[in-house]
Regions:
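Alpha-to-beta junction loops
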Residues: 54-57, 133-142
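Short helix-initiation/N-cap motifs at beta->coil->alpha
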Residues: 40-45, 118-133
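Extracytoplasmic/periplasmic substrate-recognition and gating elements
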Residues: 31-32, 113, 151-215
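A local structural motif
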Residues: 31-36, 109-123, 135, 153-159
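Periplasmic solute-binding protein
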Residues: 2-36, 44, 63-89, 172-181
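Short, solvent-exposed loop/beta-turn-alpha elements that line the ligand-binding surface or hinge
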Residues: 1, 35, 78-103, 151-155, ...
């Protein structure tokens, strides 16, 4: 658990998510002779081919957080680890205004052209459903999308493909946590401890993360 020296809160992590994944409908890709892309140029070529046949290349919900998810994956893939850290951790102005950043926005513009008119405001799981149903070929989404495929009874390499988005071995991740604030009342404190212990229990971690598509915070 992460605490701020016991002053106001403690945070109990429940999982670790990798964000930069491509999900794809196996039947759509196989029937069009397309493999999971290992570079952005390969993805663009595949998307152009699919679009020419009237297939939506990229299922996406153009909500701010989903746009940010795609942008970060593209930035890491094109710029690399050092570029990403300088741009988004250090906020280095030279990096933010570089030719590499222009390439990143060029790729984002391409991706926008591969989505359908219904993209704005679409929930992420609806976009995942488009891939599952063969209405679209790809989705760029975190590993929580696996939970949708699993709930539908679909299996990897049988019904769908998944692979990391193109990068130089970098990756993006986040941690889901429950925050416990400092409160008065021993009964409330004991309740917090019980909830934290249950969430960090091995059985809960195994079952929860299997369905969530994430990595257990505790192995």
């Amino acid at each position: 658990m992460k605490c701020d020296d016991g002053k106001a809160y403690c945070a109990a992590p429940v999982n670790i998510h990798r964000i930069d994944w491509f999900w794809a409908n196996k039947k759509v890709l196989d029937s069009n002779g397309i493999k999971m892309p290992t570079s952005w140029s390969e993805f663009n070529a595949a998307a152009d081919k699919l679009q020419a046949k009237g297939i939506i290349p990229l299922a996406h919900g153009s909500q701010p957080w989903q746009d940010a998810t795609v942008f970060e994956a593209v930035a890491l893939g094109i710029g690399g680890n050092k570029f990403y850290k300088k741009a988004f951790v250090d906020a280095d102005t030279k990096t933010l205004g570089s030719s590499t950043m222009v390439k990143i926005f060029d790729q984002m513009r391409k991706l926008k052209g591969y989505t359908d008119p219904g993209s704005p405001g679409r929930d992420w799981n609806v976009a995942t459903g488009m891939v599952m149903e063969g209405k679209a070929a790809f989705q760029l989404m975190g590993d929580w999308a696996k939970g949708e495929f699993a709930a539908a009874g679909l299996k990897p390499d049988v019904d769908y493909y998944c692979a990391a988005t193109p990068s130089d071995n970098g990756y993006l991740y986040n941690v889901d946590s429950f925050i416990f604030f400092k409160i008065k009342g021993q009964d409330k404190v004991e309740g917090q401890k019980l909830l934290a212990s249950l969430m960090m229990g091995k059985n809960f971690q195994k079952v929860f993360n299997m369905y969530k598509g994430s990595i257990p915070a505790r192995l």
